[in-house]
Regions:
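N-terminal signal-anchor transmembrane helix specifying type II single-pass membrane topology
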Residues: 2-56
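Cell-envelope/extracellular polymer assembly enzymes that use nucleotide-activated donors
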Residues: 139-144, 173, 344
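Acidic donor-binding segment of Leloir-type glycosyltransferases
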Residues: 163-204
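Glycine-rich, basic loop-to-helix element that forms the pyrophosphate-binding segment
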Residues: 188, 205-222
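A recurrent flexible, glycine/aromatic-enriched loop bordering the glycosyltransferase active site
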Residues: 212, 287-319, 327
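Short aromatic/hydrophobic "clamp" motif used to bind/position activated sugar donors
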Residues: 227
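Conserved donor NDP-sugar-binding/catalytic core segment of glycosyltransferases
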Residues: 235, 239-291, 355
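Lectin-like carbohydrate-binding module/patch detector with strong preference for beta-trefoil
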Residues: 434-493
Length: 493
């Protein structure tokens, strides 16, 4: 289903029309209504939003107004304009700070002292400020934020950031999905707080669902034409929403991600930059990776403000047409908690006729925790599901690098395979050749890969375990007891 889907594929069958005199009467009423609208001015806002694009009007500044205005700038406030904060603490205060980091893997002690409404430095390309939008023609979005035992300040800073940077005319609602939290501050206290905010509603899961199903719970009650998923510790840059919605208005099968800027977990410094965004990729262990934009994609784009095609997404932040999300089969509900769902959805988007893009004019800051605060034990099974459904014979390259994955229970994928057949999706070879030609496909011939065993020391193998996950090359190879799991003991010659 390459290109734009026909409207007949999106909406159900039309009801039968009236006949005879009823038809004439209906036509007459419609004509009269059209005359009244022509005589008495433009139609209501919702109808006008479905009209063809119009030239920017003088009231565009009015249309850009967010749901809430930010408080006046306080240049001396902690963390204002994304500045790093380092507190001088007493021993007792330092212990409380360390406890907050241990519990959340984020410096919540500091976060609680930074305004929920802080302003961010400008981090987009200068040309992005010049872009004009026809706000009446853009669709509305529901922003879905799932959380589990999230700290108060990071969760509420996310909510206020959306409310204070999103045009009122474009934000249908924020849906907070509580994935069965047990912290007291997320119960009645949160309910009372949210009750005082426009366009924010809180729904609760009846049991622990995990990120995938919690997001689907939010999507199931969303009223907006577009679903925008955000993590629960984000801050939105000025003008972040319009580019996402405008691109989907142009192409309904585009799934669009913002540029993800890093917010330091310890100092809350906003580390985004206005340079060329990186795109998502993966390696044959099915680990998500970042890469520079390839030359072929740079040549395809006509402007620095055009969206960038990306083979994969990080997964936490993106916008998608609600109808197209449903058409694609939404999330794989057989996946647990989080991990691997981003690659599975990325493969499905591309192989089933859509496109996955990153928009350089949309920036959202994200606090990357010191380490994952909750277990990712189910991530392996999620990756196996992705490999089994979408990777065809190339799944063997994954299994060679993760031998233990062959033994991992991954549930029933019959429905997902039937979905692939129903949507007439392309094979993984097409994906590699057309979407991600930069990814090297190894031969993996027998005898050319495996573990290198030391013959002088019984049961010891070459082991490569970088101490810094962001710098995986140029580090020392050591000897370590052979574990038979591949991964950091897998060698190729």
């Amino acid at each position: 289903m390459a290109g734009r889907l026909g409207r007949g594929m999106w909406w159900g069958k039309r009801g039968r029309g009236c006949r005879g005199e009823g038809t004439l009467l209906a036509l007459g009423l419609l004509a009269a209504l059209g005359f009244l609208v022509w005589r008495h001015g433009p139609p209501p806002l919702r109808a006008a939003r479905r009209a063809p694009p119009q030239p920017p009007s003088p009231d565009s500044e009015l249309l850009r107004r967010p749901v809430y205005a930010k408080p006046a700038l306080d240049p001396g406030a902690l963390g204002e304009l994304g500045r790093a904060v380092r507190l001088e603490l007493s021993p007792a205060e330092k212990r409380r700070q360390e406890e907050s980091i241990r519990r959340h893997q984020i410096n919540i002690y500091l976060s609680d002292r930074i305004s929920l409404h802080r302003r961010l430095p400008e981090r987009w390309h200068p040309l992005c400020r010049e872009k004009k939008y026809d706000y009446y023609s853009l669709p509305k979005t529901s922003v879905v934020i799932a959380f589990y035992n999230e700290a108060w300040s990071t969760l509420l800073r996310t909510v206020h950031s959306v409310l204070e940077t999103s045009p009122d005319i474009l934000l249908e609602e924020i849906i907070l999905v509580d994935d069965y939290s047990d912290k007291e501050h997320l119960k009645e206290t949160l309910e009372n707080y949210v009750a005082g905010l426009r366009k924010v509603r809180l729904i609760r899961a009846n049991k622990r669902e995990g990120l995938v199903r919690a997001r689907l719970l939010g999507a199931s009650v969303a009223k907006g034409d577009i679903l925008t998923f955000l993590d629960c510790h984000c801050e939105c840059h000025e003008g972040w929403l319009e580019p996402l919605l405008a691109r989907i208005a142009e192409e309904e099968t585009a799934v669009v991600c913002p540029v993800i800027d890093v917010i330091d977990w310890n100092t809350f410094e906003y580390l985004g930059n206005a340079g060329e965004p990186q795109i998502g990729g993966f390696d044959w262990r099915l680990v998500f990776t970042w890469h520079s934009t390839p030359e072929r994609e740079q040549k395809r784009r006509k402007s620095k403000t055009d969206s960038i095609r990306s083979p994969t997404m990080a997964g936490g932040l993106f916008s998608v047409s609600k109808k197209y999300f449903d058409y694609l089969g939404s999330y794989d509900t057989g996946m647990e908690v989080w991990g691997g769902e981003n690659l599975e959805f990325s493969f499905r988007i591309w192989q089933c006729g859509g496109s996955l893009e990153i928009h350089p004019c949309s920036h959202v800051g994200h606090v990357f925790p010191k380490q994952a605060p909750y277990s990712r034990a189910k991530a392996l099974a999620n990756s196996v599901r992705a490999a089994e459904v979408w990777m065809d014979e190339y799944k063997q390259l994954y299994y060679h690098r993760n031998p233990h994955a062959r033994l991992e229970p991954y549930g029933d994928v019959t429905e997902r395979r039937l979905l692939r057949e129903k949507l007439k999706c392309k094979d993984f070879k097409w994906f590699l050749e057309n979407v991600y030609p930069e990814l090297h496909v190894p031969e993996d011939r027998p005898g050319f890969f495996g573990m290198l065993k030391n013959r002088g020391m019984e049961n010891f193998c070459f082991d490569y375990n970088p101490t810094n996950e962001h710098q995986v090359t140029g580090q020392r190879v050591t000897l370590y007891p052979c574990h038979g799991m591949g991964q950091n003991q897998l060698s190729f010659v």
